[in-house]
C-alpha cells in the first residue's frame, strides 16, 4: 500500500528572456559665420546626408547655431554623415563649399547590453560665408578750348558702355575738368569692362569739335573676398576744340 509520484516535465524547462537595449542617440551642432554683413535667422540652409541621401535640412539661428535633430540607434554599427551648406542665389555672397564629415560608432556593452554612440566631429565645424562689398571707381577727362576762354558747362560728353548705351552725360567745368560719376561693380561683375567717352557735337558756328572716341577699360579683380577695380585710360584724355 505505497504511493508513487511520477513527474512528467515538458521538453523545454528553461524560461528564456530577451533583453532589448534602449536606443541611444547622437546629435550634431555646427555654426555659421557671416563676414561683411549682419547674420540673420534662417539666412542660410544646411543639409545632413547619409549615404548621399539628405535626411535633415536645417537653417541657422540668429546666433549662427545650426542644430540638427537627434538621431536614434537601436543596434551596433558605424555611420558616416556629411554636412554641407546649400549654395544660395545671392551673387554678392561667397558661400562655403565645405563638406564636413561626422562619424558615429555605436557599440554595445557586453555585460550590460547598453548601447553607446560615440560621435567624432570634424576639426572645422564652422561654415564661413562672406558678403562681398561692391567696388567703386571713377575717372576724369579734360576739355581744352583754343581761341577763347572756356565756359563752365559749355561742352557735353557722354560715357557709353561696350554696347553703345549712354550711361552718363556730363559737361565740363570752367577749369576744363569733365568729372564722371562713380561706376559700381558687384561680385558678379568680376572681369573686363570697356567704355568710350565722346564729345557731343554742338552747333556753334565756327567751333571745331573733337571727334575723339576715348576708350576706357576697367578690370575688376578679386583678392580673396575683396573686389578691386583698375582703370586703364588712353594716353590722350583731353578733348581739344
Each predicted region: which residue ranges?
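Solvent-exposed loop/turn and edge beta-strand elements of beta-rich ligand-binding domains
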Residues: 1-241
Amino acid at each position: 500500500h505505497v504511493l508513487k509520484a511520477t513527474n512528467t516535465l515538458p521538453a523545454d524547462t528553461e524560461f528564456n528572456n530577451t533583453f532589448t537595449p534602449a536606443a541611444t542617440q547622437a546629435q550634431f551642432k555646427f555654426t555659421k559665420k557671416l563676414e561683411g554683413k549682419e547674420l540673420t535667422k534662417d539666412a542660410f540652409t544646411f543639409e545632413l546626408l547619409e549615404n548621399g541621401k539628405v535626411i535633415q535640412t536645417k537653417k541657422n539661428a540668429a546666433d549662427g547655431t545650426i542644430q540638427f535633430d537627434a538621431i536614434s540607434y537601436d543596434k551596433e554599427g558605424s555611420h558616416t554623415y556629411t554636412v554641407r551648406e546649400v549654395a544660395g542665389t545671392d551673387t554678392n555672397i561667397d558661400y562655403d563649399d565645405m563638406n564636413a564629415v561626422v562619424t558615429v560608432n555605436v557599440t554595445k556593452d557586453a555585460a550590460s547590453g547598453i548601447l553607446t554612440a560615440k560621435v567624432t566631429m570634424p576639426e572645422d565645424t564652422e561654415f564661413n560665408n562672406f558678403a562681398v562689398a561692391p567696388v567703386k571707381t571713377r575717372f576724369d577727362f579734360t576739355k581744352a578750348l583754343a581761341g577763347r576762354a572756356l565756359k563752365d558747362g559749355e561742352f557735353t560728353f557722354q560715357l557709353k558702355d561696350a554696347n553703345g548705351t549712354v550711361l552718363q552725360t556730363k559737361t565740363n567745368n570752367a577749369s576744363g575738368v569733365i568729372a564722371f560719376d562713380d561706376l559700381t561693380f558687384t561680385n558678379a561683375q568680376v572681369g573686363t569692362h570697356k567704355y568710350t567717352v565722346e564729345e557731343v557735337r554742338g552747333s556753334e558756328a565756327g567751333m571745331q569739335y573733337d571727334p575723339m572716341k576715348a576708350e576706357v577699360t576697367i578690370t575688376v579683380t578679386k583678392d580673396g573676398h575683396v573686389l578691386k577695380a583698375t582703370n586703364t585710360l588712353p594716353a590722350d584724355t583731353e578733348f581739344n576744340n
